[in-house]
């Protein structure tokens, strides 16, 4: 049995994450989704709380048909200890999937198998781009699973993102 870990900030969870997780699910029997920087929220780059991100992810993956654990992981700002922190906060896992060079290095040095999944449509599917679209009142809904649209609407995330970004001046006509 293979239990795999995939860590991301998921600000918000989008179709790129969804594609990668579905690819991982073809190789693993159980999945652990680690919500990185769980302590961050209500910031332009991190508008959603860990709990809101849990709702997005569990809603989007309800049809995965695999055991799934969604675990918030707070930053500890001591990279040398971070892998131990992650291990303490998650069920035991056999491998990690990541495209983040620091995460790859830290887990590799800890002797854990690290696989780098191919990014999916990275040019259009990034949390930054989706947050910018929301902030600028442009269509964004097609870039995230329907469950994520529902959560963002339910928590009034659109107005939160716009308020957090109101002073950046990057949106024409705003």
Swiss-Prot record:
GO terms for cellular component: cytoplasm. Transmembrane segments: none annotated. It catalyses: beta-nicotinamide D-ribonucleotide + ATP + H(+) = diphosphate + NAD(+). Belongs to the archaeal NMN adenylyltransferase family. PANTHER family: BIFUNCTIONAL NMN ADENYLYLTRANSFERASE_NUDIX HYDROLASE (PTHR21342:SF0), PHOSPHOPANTETHEINE ADENYLYLTRANSFERASE (PTHR21342). The keyword NAD applies. GO terms for molecular function: ATP binding; nicotinamide-nucleotide adenylyltransferase activity. This is Nicotinamide-nucleotide adenylyltransferase. It is found in: Cytoplasm. Pathway: Cofactor biosynthesis; NAD(+) biosynthesis; NAD(+) from nicotinamide D-ribonucleotide: step 1/1. It is an enzyme of class 2 (transferase). NCBIfam families: arch_NMN_Atrans, cyt_tran_rel, PRK01153.1. Its EC number is 2.7.7.1. The keyword Oxidoreductase does not apply. One of its GO terms (biological process) is NAD biosynthetic process. Keywords: ATP-binding, Cytoplasm, NAD, Nucleotide-binding, Nucleotidyltransferase, Pyridine nucleotide biosynthesis, Transferase. Its main location: cytoplasm.
